[in-house]
Amino acid sequence: MVVIRLARGGAKARPFFNIVVADKRTRRDGRFIERLGFYNPIATANEESIRIAQDRLTYWRSVGAQASPTVERLISQAAKKAA
């Protein structure tokens, strides 16, 4: 099964997450199929905190990829910012 989830990056106490498409059986930060965007939880006011490639997200959902609950929340936040 293919899932859309967060892969952690960044330094200790400075998290940064990539939004990736990966096989469900791989490790959280392991190999992934495609990077769809990023989430920076500690972004300052003048930095971008969420970016998601909507066209690729739509494609992966159309072929059956399931998004994690956290990614679902981030998708809705990004949609509110875009509107």
From Swiss-Prot:
Q: Which GO terms describe its biological process?
A: translation
Q: Which UniProt keywords apply?
A: Ribonucleoprotein, Ribosomal protein
Mind telling me which GO cellular component terms the entry cites?
Answer: cytoplasm; small ribosomal subunit
List the SUPFAM superfamilies hit by this protein, alphabetically. Ribosomal protein S16
* Organism whose genome encodes this protein: Albidiferax ferrireducens (strain ATCC BAA-621 / DSM 15236 / T118)
Say which family it is in: Belongs to the bacterial ribosomal protein bS16 family.
Pfam families attached here? Ribosomal_S16 (PF00886)
> In its UniProt entry, what is this protein called?
Small ribosomal subunit protein bS16
Q: Name one GO molecular function term.
A: structural constituent of ribosome
| Matching PROSITE patterns | RIBOSOMAL_S16
**Gene3D superfamilies for this protein:** 3.30.1320.10
